[in-house]
């Protein structure tokens, strides 16, 4: 009996330590992430009260936001759970007429059905149900052998994965705050340029070192199969000025260069669709991942799709857009959105 009580006490102490540690990390995260936002808001007559986790208009004294989850950028717990659950959020979008890729969920219990019976349309996508930052997202899977190998690898890490139809086009991130579009950036697919001397592997390392020196994310998810399909291997030396794409995981955290898009050039039908998706999940702040051949063309004319919605939104991609030529663009728009 005494041993059982001792075990219970130890478990309680571990739980207390875990909760305390996470609270401290949340406050630290709030402090680090919102430094630039706080400075910009102060320029517009606002201040962030880090104790109350609110944004206050100084001359009015009005609390604009007061949320419990600072690391989720003003979003409540229920909305956070829906956004994190990619199958659920995409199902909500589909029911409400928002274009998303078709998907099914695969786990250890039903994987044989999808391997041996299901009619998979290639190329396809396999990714974690609740992944972030493009981690373990596998796009342009071209055949059954690739599919089986990738599926088995993913199911060693995750309880379930999503199988999606492959969507084509350029990759965009739409930052929405206060039910308004604050900024839009296009992620450029990572590539290398041959110089006639260095191998593919050397060129990739050189580019990653350059990205790291600029405090940007390197391309860690290298797709060697994709590179081989372009006629190259690790040790092969590309011709001078030859452009070789090195990954199909087009994500800022995987070395994709962000380029700002003029919001005024995006048609109203697209902007309304983005905001509708944001509101359906009841979010205050979100990052929509959208794919189309051209975001300035109405989505119903060029098969544009929302890939997913994120509620833990990284502002760094917006700061670094266009080689950091307008690092405060996003935060100035956020400040201007408070019409008091």
What are these model-predicted stretches?
Residues 57, 61-66, 173-177, 181-183, ...:
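A short beta-strand motif that forms the metal-chelation/ATP-contact edge
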Residues 39-43, 94-95, 229, 276, ...:
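Residues at alpha-helix termini
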Residues 205-296:
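A long amphipathic alpha-helix within ATP-dependent nucleotide-binding catalytic cores
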Residues 2-84, 88-91:
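ATP-binding N-terminal substructure of ATP-dependent carboxylate-amine bond-forming enzymes
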Residues 258-265, 279-285, 292-340:
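C-terminal active-site "lid" helix and adjoining low-complexity regulatory extension at the edge
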Residues 62-220, 267-272:
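Active-site nucleotide/adenylate-binding loops and adjacent lid/helix of ATP-dependent enzymes
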Residues 48-51, 126, 162-163, 288:
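General beta-strand structural signal in soluble alpha/beta enzymes
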Residues 53-54, 106-107, 290-291:
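Residue-level "edge-of-site" marker
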């Amino acid at each position: 009996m005494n041993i059982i009580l001792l075990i219970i006490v130890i478990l309680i102490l571990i739980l207390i330590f875990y909760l305390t540690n996470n609270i401290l990390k949340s406050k630290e995260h709030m402090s680090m992430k919102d430094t630039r936002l706080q400075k910009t808001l102060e320029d517009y007559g606002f201040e962030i009260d880090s104790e109350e986790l609110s944004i206050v208009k100084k001359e009015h004294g009005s609390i604009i936001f007061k949320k419990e989850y600072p690391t989720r950028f003003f979003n409540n717990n229920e909305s956070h759970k829906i956004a994190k659950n990619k199958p659920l959020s995409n199902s909500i979008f589909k029911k409400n007429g928002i274009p998303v890729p078709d998907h099914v969920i695969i786990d250890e219990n039903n994987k044989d059905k999808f391997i041996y019976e299901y009619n998979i349309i290639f190329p396809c996508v396999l990714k974690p149900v609740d992944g972030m930052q493009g981690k373990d997202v596998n796009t342009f899977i071209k055949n059954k052998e690739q599919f089986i190998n990738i599926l088995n690898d993913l199911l060693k890490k995750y309880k379930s994965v999503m199988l999606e139809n492959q969507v084509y086009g350029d990759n965009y991130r739409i930052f929405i705050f206060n039910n308004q579009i604050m900024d839009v950036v296009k992620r450029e697919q990572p590539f290398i340029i041959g110089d006639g001397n260095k191998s593919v592997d050397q060129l990739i390392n050189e580019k990653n070192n350059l990205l790291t020196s600029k405090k940007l994310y390197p391309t860690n998810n290298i797709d060697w199969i994709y590179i081989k399909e372009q006629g190259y291997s690790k040790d092969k030396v590309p011709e001078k000025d030859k452009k070789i794409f090195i990954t199909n995981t087009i994500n800022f955290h995987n070395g994709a260069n962000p380029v700002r898009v003029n919001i005024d050039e995006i048609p109203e039908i697209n902007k309304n669709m983005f905001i509708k998706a944001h509101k359906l999940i009841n979010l205050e702040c979100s990052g929509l991942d959208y794919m189309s051949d051209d975001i300035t063309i109405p989505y119903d004319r060029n098969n544009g799709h929302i890939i997913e919605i994120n509620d833990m939104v990284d502002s760094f991609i917006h700061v670094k857009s266009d080689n950091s030529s307008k690092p405060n663009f996003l935060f100035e728009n956020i400040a201007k959105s408070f019409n008091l």
